[in-house]
Every structure is written in structure tokens, then in C-alpha cells.
């Protein structure tokens, strides 16, 4: 049985930020999850972050985007808005600078016992933690309308499922939604040669 003061469940940007802050505060941290998996696997290559480079993951203000740009020899002016590839590189740079140890494994169960938490991993191992911080990300929270299932499979996709647009070259596409991901995916569909895109 493994132990930790704080178990961070998830390995995305907010998990990294919280774990770094906790470690900086002297807390023994374990991070479990697939490192930046949603961002690497569910985001299209041409996507830009809605946020500019004036924010960062570091509560201490040390490993900021500015520090990353300087270290990489990049210009802030050339990278605003921030491309997804640059964001992924920043998160890896941040993780390395903060020496965050991410265990690439998934949780299968969590129970409370005797004032602690017992996390069971998919491989059957357990971690006992005094505190747990859940940072599962948005992958599991796709909002699908009730009529979604009525549209034949292969003719519908949530934005989190559609990361390659080549198959829609020349197609007519309806994007249902009115927030950032709807407009971003509409623009990406146009960039990849969709005949028509209606939002």
C-alpha cells in the first residue's frame, strides 16, 4: 500500500498547477492520470487557446508563460493567441521545471476509511491519502442534446470526438452550439475545406 499526504487525481493543467502549489507548500503529493491526455488526443492540431499568454500555471509566479517564452527563445507577440502545440510544450516545460512526478495510471475506485482515502488503481494497487484533489478535466462532461442519439452514428460528433477534419473536406456541416468550441470547430472545418458550415 502506497501513501501520500495529497493524491491528485488527473494529470491536466489544473492538476499540474494544484500539485505544484501543494509541493511548494511542503505537502507530499502523488499525481495519477494520463499526462495531458485530453489536450493531446481530443484537441485539433490547429486550435488556439482562448486565453492569452498573460496567465500561467504557477501560483509562485516563477514558471510563467513569459519565463517559458524566454527559455525557448520565443516571442510573446508571435504567440498570441497561443497555439495548442505551444500550450502542450509549456505544460511539459512547467512539469519538468517543477519536477512533478506524474504516474501514468488510472483510478478505478475511491473510498473513505478511518479518516483517510483509499484509492484503488486499475492495476489493483492502492494509495492511501490524507486528502484528495479531483481534477478529472472536462473529457467526461460532454453536454449532448436529447436528439443527439437520433442522428445516425457516423453523421454526428461532439467537438471532443472530432479532432481530425480531413473526412469532412467538401462536406456540408451543421455545428450546434454558440460558445467557443462551436465557433472554433466551425473555423477549423472551413480551414480544412468543408463546402459549407452553418452554426
Which stretches of residues belong to each language-model region?
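Phosphate-coordination loops involved in phosphoryl transfer and adenosine-cofactor binding
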Residues: 3-5, 104, 169-171
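Helical element adjacent to the flavin cofactor pocket in flavoenzyme catalytic cores
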Residues: 85-102, 139-142
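N-terminal Rossmann-like FAD-binding beta1-loop-alpha1 element of flavoenzymes
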Residues: 2-31, 174-192
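Glycine-rich dinucleotide-binding loop and its adjacent helix/turn
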Residues: 83, 136-193
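A conserved short coil-to-beta-strand element within the FAD-binding core of flavoproteins
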Residues: 103-116
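Core beta-strand elements of the Rossmann-like FAD/NAD(P) dinucleotide-binding domain
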Residues: 2-4, 122-131
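Glycine-rich active-site loop/strand segments that organize a redox cofactor
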Residues: 32-86, 199
Amino acid at each position: 500500500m502506497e501513501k501520500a499526504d495529497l493524491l491528485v487525481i488527473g494529470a491536466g493543467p489544473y492538476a499540474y498547477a494544484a500539485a505544484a502549489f501543494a509541493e511548494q507548500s511542503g505537502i507530499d503529493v502523488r499525481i495519477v492520470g494520463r499526462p495531458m491526455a485530453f489536450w493531446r488526443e481530443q484537441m485539433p492540431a490547429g486550435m488556439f487557446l482562448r486565453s492569452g499568454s498573460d496567465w500561467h500555471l504557477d501560483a509562485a509566479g516563477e514558471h510563467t508563460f513569459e519565463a517559458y517564452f524566454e527559455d525557448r527563445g520565443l516571442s510573446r507577440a508571435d504567440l498570441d493567441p497561443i497555439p495548442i502545440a505551444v500550450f502542450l510544450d509549456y505544460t511539459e516545460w512547467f512539469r519538468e521545471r517543477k519536477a512533478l512526478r506524474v504516474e501514468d495510471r488510472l483510478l478505478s475506485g475511491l473510498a473513505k476509511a478511518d479518516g483517510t482515502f483509499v484509492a484503488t488503481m486499475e492495476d489493483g494497487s492502492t494509495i492511501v491519502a490524507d486528502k484528495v484533489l479531483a481534477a478529472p478535466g472536462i473529457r467526461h462532461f460532454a453536454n449532448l442534446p436529447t436528439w443527439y442519439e437520433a442522428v445516425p452514428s457516423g453523421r454526428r460528433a461532439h467537438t471532443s470526438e472530432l479532432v481530425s477534419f480531413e473526412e469532412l473536406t467538401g462536406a456540408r456541416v451543421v455545428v450546434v452550439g454558440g460558445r467557443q468550441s462551436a465557433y472554433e470547430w466551425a473555423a477549423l472545418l472551413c480551414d480544412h475545406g468543408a463546402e459549407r458550415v452553418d452554426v
